[in-house]
Amino acid sequence: MSFRLKPLIVALFASQLSACAVGPDYIRPQAPVATEFKEVKGWKTAQPRDTALSGQWWEIFNDPKLNELESQVASNQSLIQAEAQYRQAQGLVQSAQSSLLPVFNLNGNFNNFKSAQGQTQVISGVRTLFGNTVAMAWEPDLWGKVRRQIEANTGNAQASAATLQALRLSIQSNLAVAYFQLKVLDAQRTLLDETVAAYQKTLDITKNRYAVGVVAKTDVVQADTQLQSAKAQAINLGVQRAKLEHAIAVLIGKSPAELSLAASALTTQAPAIPVSLPSELLERRPDIAAAERKVAAANAQIGIAKAAYFPTLNLAMSNGFQSTDVGDLFTVARRYWAFGPAAAALTVFDGGVKNAQYNQAIAGFDASVAAYRQAVLTGFQEVEDNLAALRILEEQAKVQDQAVASANQALALTNNQYQAGTVSYLNVMTAQTAALSNRQTAVQLQGDRLNAAVLLVKAMGGGWNETLLPTEEQAAGDRKWTDYLILPVDTIGEWVE
């Protein structure tokens, strides 16, 4: 390359970096945010050091088995797929960044030729011409199209990272909900086993009373009906439990055959969960962050569409050596260079394609803004839903405990009356059914409260916050100088082999 061309190349690079980028610069859109949650009265305001807001949020339930299962979520195949999609998005950022740089090609060649007869200035006979050339092609980013593409791809990569975290939180919460529901079924099974034992005892007593002529045969049949019905309910729980166990296995990346969970008592109570301010929710939920980053990407697409209206400039340059003697090919005397062609192009008629693409970009931006605001509203709804659920379920649980106590008392009184012969066995059956139903409801309420607690943590982001989003450098994969080579350094050995 001629020394006189070097200042020109430097100037072109500098002009590219300082040139304007057409299209609107990104401004985060306004979102509907309330000053406080409707259901927040009586709740503790979240603080940065609250355990419930940490990444290991499930530990607030103090269940070692749940902790063990949650630690295996990284093996979930959907999560692995999402992580790969994030790396794909990083690759798109890298590809866009590379478009800012010129492309260099190294060419080596030789040609055999024979001069025409009668050319006295050319040595006659067959000769070989050797050549070695480095060619450069470059399209300067005069209008910021490439830089806007980098912005768009960076926004999409950051959105992909946030989507990955949203999926992780969803899998974690689904696992916790399935686990607690399984424990509810175990508690229901324990309750039914106790009921079956009680009904069996009642049936035996009724048979003895029938044998001595105190009660009718119908009492024995009715007592046996109650017993068999309770047994059938207990067996039916096995179907639901098996499905939940299989679902848990898949959530942690295992086949159903690889996981068996022993039955355990339902002793976990819904913990107190600090609630953050509505304005903080925008920074804590990865799905909202993903929607906002998609808005940024859509905004950059407007600039890309607008840059298409402006002319493009393509530059080419070559530098190399030519000689008929390979021995002196790389000497100064055999060196040559060429600048050009330099070509500028401007589309003057395209049938409205660019206008359509620009309008499409504007519409895409508007759609992404609406999607972002909808994500915010949905986030607020989910927090309110689960705050209300926890409040109402707590009230219901208190009343239900009283109902269980009353039903148990009624059953005891009815049994005494039946043994005294003052009521029929139908009264006993009614009291038994009421007692069992109320106890089952109490167990289910405990599970519902645990589920609502899990979903509230999920609704508040599970300890995630915007600072965990990848930076622009991280969205590009923290590129090293070796990443700009044709072959990554760590794969050259593989290619050689």
PLM feature segments, named:
Residues S2-S71, F130, T154, G238-E283, ...:
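Terminal intrinsically disordered/low-complexity segments used for targeting and assembly
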Residues I80-V93, Q97-S99, L192, V196, ...:
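Long, contiguous alpha-helical "rod/stalk" segments
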Residues T414-L450:
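C-terminal structured "cap/appendage" subdomains that terminate the fold
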Residues D25-I27, Q56, N62-E68, I80-E83, ...:
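Small/polar-residue-enriched beta-strand and adjacent coil segments characteristic
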Residues A21, V146, A162-L277, A389, ...:
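Periplasmic alpha-helical coiled-coil/stalk elements that build and connect Gram-negative outer-membrane
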Residues Y210-V214, Y418-T422, A459-G463:
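A short glycine-centered flexible hinge/capping loop motif at secondary-structure junctions
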